[in-house]
């Protein structure tokens, strides 16, 4: 299986959301869609984008940048999912969307995620001005 994420911008290109789609990759490497795509972020005002995903066992982590959700420019947010035991392809949200960055002044961007184990992820990102040297 593979998970694809992308940003979908609305008509005025100011508001955008992060979407994901699960794919099955056959032996001959032909992808087929599993289920329907869905929006990952719950905060839908302004721009959400620059998403990254990682998987481990039955867990999938998604992280992204969100404009003004943390009160100051871009912040980093994440959501964990697990695959459904009832059938292949269904993703079930684990917990709620969480803010990753604790320093909120200025821009936090370019998140990257790796799953360390099921339900444990590590996320790294750029933080501008956090050390006050710009």
Where are these regions (language model features)?
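Extracellular, repeat-based ectodomains that mediate carbohydrate processing or recognition
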Residues: 1-134
């Amino acid at each position: 299986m593979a998970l694809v994420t992308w940003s979908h911008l609305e008509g005025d290109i100011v508001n955008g959301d992060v979407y994901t789609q699960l794919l099955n990759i056959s032996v001959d490497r032909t992808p087929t869609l599993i289920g329907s795509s869905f929006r990952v972020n719950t905060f839908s005002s302004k721009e959400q984008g620059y998403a990254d995903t990682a998987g481990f066992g039955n867990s999938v982590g998604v992280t992204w940048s969100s404009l003004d959700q943390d009160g100051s420019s871009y912040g980093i947010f994440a959501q964990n999912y697990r695959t459904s035991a009832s059938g292949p392809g269904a993703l079930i949200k684990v917990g709620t969307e969480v803010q990753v960055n604790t320093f909120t002044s200025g821009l936090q961007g370019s998140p990257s995620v790796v799953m360390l184990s099921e339900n444990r992820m590590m996320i790294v990102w750029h933080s501008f001005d956090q050390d006050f040297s710009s």
